[in-house]
Amino acid sequence: MADKYQEILRTYWGYPDFRGIQRDIIESIARGEDTLGLMPTGGGKSITFQVPALTQKGVCIVVTPLIALMKDQVQHLKARNILAEAIYTGLSRQEILRILENCIFGEIKFLYVSPERLSSELFQTKLRHIPVSFITVDEAHCISQWGYDFRPSYLEIAKIRDMKPGVPVLALTATATPDVVEDIQNQLHFKKQNVFKMSFARKNLAYVVRTTNDKLTEMVHILQCTQGSAIIYARSRKRTKEMAELLNKQGISATFYHAGLDSDVKDIRQKNWQNDEIRVMVATNAFGMGIDKSDVRMVIHIDCPDSLEAYFQEAGRGGRDGEKAYAVLLYNQSDENKLMKRIDETFPDKEFIKDVYEHLAYFFQVAVGSGMGQTFMFEIEKFCFTYKYFPTRVDSALRILERSGYIHYEDNPDGKARIRFNISRNDLYLLENVSEKEESVITGLLRNYGGLFTDYVYIDESLIERVSELNRQQVYMILKNLSARHIIDFIPRRKTPYISYTRPREDGFRVIIPEEVWEVRKKQFTAHIKSIISYAKNDSICRSRQLLSYFGEKTKMKDDCGICDVCIDHKIPQKQTIISEILDLLKDGKPHDITELNQLKYDSEDMASVLEEMVAENMFYVEGDKIVHDP
């Protein structure tokens, strides 16, 4: 007989039962215990907080840095008739106030919040009156300074706990070393240690490192010899475009994705890839978080990530359906040189950081003692041209200044426009002095979007252009005019990065960069760089075991995955024997039924692996259910 958790799972998600440690985590947080769940990518983290929250009174607050994931999960919850909202950088004060009031007086079950919003006075004032069931911390490794993706804003969560002392916390992450596991619990003020961990082993995912000086040719070769959806990760935005163009010329359908693209373009490309209209997504690390696509057969890293944590998380997007998939790292000596150079690029000297802070004030014309709370649009190219800086070093300096508490730097703001009608539908029909063009825009909005009279709705201005037969500038000015007349509330899209001062501006020489922000993190970053280099160069230990060991799982030789490049190479003597026997069977050049291979008494997985390689090397070809060797 199903219990209440299983009933909710079946009713809202249609799954018959829980997987792995999902139930353990659910029951732990439902008992009011602070809980840390370690689950690999695709392990079903969201179920562990969404299910128990529906059995409790009050709002489940979900802290996550991933705006795209927030929007996606809120959309999915609303589609299941579960009330959910999200607050993140870029919303107007009016929008935030409406959401918080609904949490106090309405029936909202989930409130997704970006960590930056936790410190705002408005949020903290309203939070005191919100009935909270429990707090979920997604990407919990971000709170640890030992982690590869530390975010200072996550430290605000501990202060929120002080405001809600009886409310338990559920922390979730897909990547955490033993040190990070310990630190997460300390930083979140766990009453006692309480960790549930799934093995990070992915038995269907073959980790491969290919050493090559011609990565592009190798990449094309791999994709030509395999089938199915693929992701290729590259470090630079320019490189993603170039590689997508190269693949298309080779007859492999591909597109590219990075944080600098218009949000509408990103949405379209992501949707086309998810619907298999495009086979290959070439992307920076801006792509992948919260992407719900289980049948990715190939993940290729053409550039080395900065850490094994980042590599493991990105590689883990392959084979989430449990079917065979590959994670391939293309590597050569220049990668090691580039990675070691990244250390100084990521941690420029402190005097340079102070100079950047001083020049920001000149650039924005902010006097000493002023600026707190002010936000400025920031064009990094213009800033670098003005002061003769390299953008990479400036970007690093700004992130260190942010971690040191001087500024908030948002280099990838949400780019979609939003509107809400301020008058009722009946009053709208009674409006006078509405021009023909204004009427066409209003009609376009009403026909293509729902909920405009009750909530802020994201709109696609290019769609309104098409249906109203106006250009973008005309649509924009009409929306601005309707907003000025209080018919609608129009929030234009904002694509330009911005910087906010989080404290009054100081003289540059007074800026203090804390040891834990520079010295400690540089040491950690260096260790992360060395770990990925070591992984790429170690061709004697099973790839899966190397990764599991890094994340604190004890393994033995019997735990070798059997499918990574290291394990396959260890089987070479047997592999050569299998190849010889297959070729001997096919030596007459005639078509043979594929079932004839069953007479060769070898392990089925070993046979499958050898056959894949033989096809890739054109040693035989397949015609229906026949195989032919052309001597």
Locations of the language-model features?
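Helicase motor core with emphasis on the C-terminal RecA-like subdomain
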Residues: 1-12, 16-20, 24-46, 52-61, ...
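Amphipathic alpha-helical interaction elements
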Residues: 14, 224, 599-602, 612
